[in-house]
Curated annotation (Swiss-Prot):
One of its GO terms (biological process) is lipid transport. Residues 1-22 form the signal peptide. This is Apolipoprotein C-II. The gene is Apoc2. InterPro entries: Apo-CII, ApoC-II_dom_sf. Its main location: secreted.
Length: 100
């Protein structure tokens, strides 16, 4: 029991020490963090555009009509099944709420 208590105490003191260091660094880095936050949306947008372009190029290179037809067929069948089961689920919920 004593070793667990000492371990817990050590971890608490370690976390508190990092909190004190972190609060001092936050005051120093506020200007830098604001600039970083301003750059973040721009970099995310550029990464998203690059990823979209890469996927589009890959799709154009590997386009097969038979695969495309199969994908469209699977999508239509699965969306029909999902809408059917969603309707059944909705009816069940309404029946439970009304108490019929």
């Amino acid at each position: 029991m004593g070793s667990r208590f000492l371990l817990a105490l050590f971890l608490v003191l370690l976390v508190l020490g990092y909190e004190v260091q972190g609060s001092q660094q936050i005051q120093q880095d506020e200007a830098g963090s604001l600039a970083l936050l301003n750059k973040l949306p721009e970099s995310l947008s550029s990464y998203w555009d690059i990823a979209k372009a890469a996927v589009g190029d890959l799709y154009e290179k590997t386009y097969l009509t038979s695969v495309d037809e199969k994908l469209r067929d699977m999508y239509s069948k699965s969306s029909a099944a999902v809408s059917t089961y969603a309707g059944i689920f909705t009816d069940q919920i309404l029946t439970l709420l009304k108490g019929e």
